[in-house]
Structures are given as structure tokens and as C-alpha cells.
Amino acid sequence: MESEPKPFTQISQGKNKHTKIEEKPIKTNMNKEIKSTINKVKQSRNISLEQLKLLLEINDDEGIRFIREEAVKVCQKTYGNQVLIRGLIEFTNFCKNDCYYCGIRRSNSQADRYRLTKEQMLDCCASGYELGFRTFVLQGGEDGYFTDDKICDLVSAIKEKYPDCAVTLSIGEKSKESYKRYFDAGADRYLLRHETADEAHYKKLHPEEMSLAHRKQCLWDLKEIGYQVGCGFMVGSPGQTVETLYEDLQFIRELQPHMVGIGPFISQKDTPFADKASGTMEQTLKLLAIIRLIHPHVLLPATTALGTIHPKGRELGILSGANVVMPNLSPVNVREK
């Protein structure tokens, strides 16, 4: 008989890349249909549209905590109580794209733009390494200033200085040739949120020149090259429905990524979606739990956006099945830009 995970009571960071998560388990008298559905999803590692609707409609505190606790059990069975720590370096907020939801879209004349130098980025890595970080995530908009040569030079410099570290890139859609160059320079992982797997929904979020088919192809190219790949989506974005979320989950199941990054849509005042309601923490936590039930081995970050909408958002994400946090190593003066 499978043993229950041991109860725990605190969140604490060790001296290297792991954090222990701890919460006392709860007792619940959840209705049989929800319990049965969670067990079926967990066992089949798949979910039907009807099952997704049922789980997303859970709106009582007891029910939400129950699905979160089940997800934590699944996560513990694979990873124990460890949470992986990645150091995030946001090195540019220039972007050629004009996504309707994004604060760094090219049309946003109010954005306070910046670029970090190679030296600044290496300083960020040095600070992170001293703190015990062994993965650095280089994230930025699709900024033409950072040519393939510059990216390759940066990746090579980090790998040369810190050969025991992994380098993750999150710099958008590139050609397969560019992705291969970064990989050959030493990049290990690549994060590219697909944002939505539904064609009509994608068109509501992006201008005409952007294509869901191309974005998906980028993810397949990255996998073929040999990267550990991450995809993901926003929760509560304008036009999102249970049906589009179901498409997201089916695409993730098809892609089988190494990481899935989800977080609430947050309305940004200088975008066309300024007047749209933001996504909720409750729905995000439920979806984190659902993804964990379907994908026991996936790396699942508790994102910055969760921490933005709730002071303990990232901790609650961990206690919903997430197992990665990415503290920001960027210089303090650019973190809010």
C-alpha cells in the first residue's frame, strides 16, 4: 500500500538550489464525483473536457484545497519535498512584437526600456552562483539588438565561467538555425510559452503578423535540436474558455515538454487589454494542480505573476503542485521596468 506523504509545517531554503515545502495535510469529505474524477485523471494522466469543466468549477475552499493536496502528493512522489531554484535574469525589455496583453509590446511608448550589458549579466550570474544557483534563465523580449552572435557569446561566456551550471533561454521565436547556434554555444533549455493552443483565441491575443502555427513549430524545432523545452499559457486571458484550456492541455500532452509555465493574465494599463479583468489566483492554482496530476514529472514553476497578484502567491503555487521558483537576479533598478 502506498504510504502517505509526511506532514510538514514550513517553507525553508537550503544553502543550494533546493527549497523544502511544507504544509499540514487536511481532512476532507469531498463529494465522490470530484474524488473519482481526480483519481481517474491521476491514473490515466489525461483529462476529458467534461472532467476539466468539473474540476475548474470547484469553488469552495475545501474542494480547492483537496485538489491542491492531491497534486502535492503526486509531486512529492516524484520529487520529494524539494523545489528547484532558477535564477532569472531579465536582460532586455525591447521587443519587436505587439502582443495585445504585454507591457513591453513595441507600441507601448510609456515603457521604460533598458538593455543589460554582457558584464552586467555576468555580474548577475556571479551573485547567483554565490547564493547557490546552478541554473540561469536569460529572459527578454524579441530584441534585434541581441544578434545571434551576441547571444552565443553570452551563453559561451556563462558556460565557460560556470561549467557546472545550466543556461536557459527565453527570448521568443527564432529560426531553427538560430536555435541550433545557441544550443551549440551551450544553451541547455529553452522556454517559449505557446500562450494558447486555440487558433481563434491566439488571434484575439496577437496581431496578424504572428502565427500560432509558427510558434508551435518553434517548440517542435527546439525539441528536435535537443533542448529541454518549456511551454505554457496565461490563465484568464481575454477570450479564454474551458474549451481553449482543454486545447492547451492536449497540446502540452502532445508536446511532452520538460517544463510548463502558467500564470494569471495580469491586465497592463498601457495595452489594448487595459480594461480587461485579470486572471484569478484560484483558477491558476487549480490549473497548476491539474497539470501536476496529468504530468507527475514535469517542472512546474510558481511564477512571478502569482506573486504579483497575492503576497504568498508563489508559496501557494508550490502547495498546488508547482516545484520550481525563479527569483529575480536582475539589477534592482530594472526589475519594475
Language model segments and positions:
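Core AdoMet radical
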Residues: 106-121, 128-149, 154-219, 228-235, ...
